[in-house]
Amino acid sequence: MSFHHLCSSPSSLLHDPLPLCNLLSVYPKSTPRSFLSSYNPNSSHFHSRNLLQATHVSVQEAIPQSEKSKLVDVDLPIPEPTASKSYVWVNPKSPRASQLRRKSYDSRYSSLIKLAESLDACKPNEADVCDVITGFGGKLFEQDAVVTLNNMTNPETAPLVLNNLLETMKPSREVILYNVTMKVFRKSKDLEKSEKLFDEMLERGIKPDNATFTTIISCARQNGVPKRAVEWFEKMSSFGCEPDNVTMAAMIDAYGRAGNVDMALSLYDRARTEKWRIDAVTFSTLIRIYGVSGNYDGCLNIYEEMKALGVKPNLVIYNRLIDSMGRAKRPWQAKIIYKDLITNGFTPNWSTYAALVRAYGRARYGDDALAIYREMKEKGLSLTVILYNTLLSMCADNRYVDEAFEIFQDMKNCETCDPDSWTFSSLITVYACSGRVSEAEAALLQMREAGFEPTLFVLTSVIQCYGKAKQVDDVVRTFDQVLELGITPDDRFCGCLLNVMTQTPSEEIGKLIGCVEKAKPKLGQVVKMLVEEQNCEEGVFKKEASELIDSIGSDVKKAYLNCLIDLCVNLNKLERACEILQLGLEYDIYTGLQSKSATQWSLHLKSLSLGAALTALHVWMNDLSEAALESGEEFPPLLGINTGHGKHKYSDKGLAAVFESHLKELNAPFHEAPDKVGWFLTTSVAAKAWLESRRSAGGVSA
């Protein structure tokens, strides 16, 4: 081991009773190996060299007890013992044993510890420091100086002690004393003093060594300035210093935190190949790197690799993994990691619970999110505005009205945060989805009293609420408020108006047409053509509808077509509904509605509104009838209709429940599959027989 690493373990200095200056004066210094003429981690030289001799230990790692006896400078071999320097066994029962023990170096080490404590406690001026050192009561050797500085903690007096010792003893290896002084600065996280001391070394012509750089690098990491750590690391080669693999492993973390992801991952690849020892902090940084880049599988791979290497995850790692799985919308994996955390004896902290709330809330895992919320309340943990809002948004998505009210009341009563615009928006949306008009109006009033003007999102929810309650006049009044506030309706707002029209009695639809025309003239034109039964030339409606589709965003195209088809079905205009469905197929807005295999033909409806699903069923049955009865095409053994098993966001029923009733009305031979939720199946024989009966009866509409 290089002598400059003796500073990492003061007790190791005590195995040789000789004054260190005697050893240093006899043996010449070895020439340090150069690192690289320029730092290039991709060069074959950089990747293939053994960076250290086997005995090298970094100042950044603890030294095992078994190694302490080996802490001898590779440049300074131990001299052969002479008769004058040989050890003498002392009988512990001897009356002189106590006196001899006091003279032993163990006793001297204790006195050096007390000297370090006295120097820490004295005033930071040269006179007081000199008095303490002079009052030590004996000559200080170079080894004593190293032990003393290594045990100091006061960054104000340490440089004064260093200067005093340099002047009084003229050490042969000054760099060692500088290194242990830097360790004092590292203990107090004083990077500025470390860098200033480095400059002083250069001014005095003292060449820094590996320990100098590793100490400054670790200080920079502790101070949370990874870019400075990178700067110091990249200076090493210019001073002929070569980092050990412990320092290299630490730089994975530093490069990652500094934003140089490519370098961090490059070093990590080397670490795996050369089997460096990587600590949990570095693994945590790697997980963060992959999480920020959106490589969530990479996060899990790092987690599995560290477990395979026997590195135990810490709480920070568990929290980052849970947060990453939340961002990936993988709440089931967040739940598994949380169970690992508990199984391995960790106690979840605020960050753990916050990550779980976000993970479950974003994915609409309502019961799990509420369970974590209640556990936080039981433990007296406060929530932030963002966490409250995440829970309220989840309640809106899951229509948890009572739970939303409970969370909102808790938020108002807590002293740590106040409701903001997002809070009221989510609360109003909860009530709007359930058609609770009075509660939505009360929440809107509270929002205004709190100093927040309603946003377009809020007013969209209010209109949706009035629409569900069939309060058409209030819909019109709210629309006028939007214009009065100078808010420009967007595609989603217009889609909401269109959705309200599908829930409005036909005799009142006329009140809403004017609103739609003002909000989006092209949409108003298409709606008027549907509602007012305008006679137009063939192809005109398709042209107008196509122009509408071209004018709206891709995120709302399907919603618009669903609503237009629903409106057609409500008005009993099946031909127009089929025309709009066909447009959706041509524009690839509706995809994957049908699938065919050798054993089954299927109709997939779960992404459609009720009217669009019924229209698609009508078209499919006509296609089946044409294929079987006119073209003579053979059916596969099974035919199926897949409605899905979820509920619509603003509906109490899912497609499955509605279709079960509708298929019975048609006397269709499709029956719900007991082992496949949301699937209705029939055999080819039964289907053909039913299609024959429909044709005989005059082709009753689906």
Swiss-Prot record:
It is found in: Plastid, Chloroplast. Expressed in leaves and flowers and at lower levels in stems and flower buds. Belongs to the PPR family. P subfamily. Disruption phenotype: Reduced plant size and pale-green leaf phenotype. Residues 603-688 form the Smr domain. GO terms for biological process: chloroplast organization; chloroplast RNA processing; positive regulation of translation. This is Pentatricopeptide repeat-containing protein At4g16390, chloroplastic. GO terms for molecular function: mRNA binding; nucleotide binding. GO terms for cellular component: chloroplast; chloroplast stroma. Residues 1-53 form a transit peptide. Gene3D superfamilies: Tetratricopeptide repeat domain.
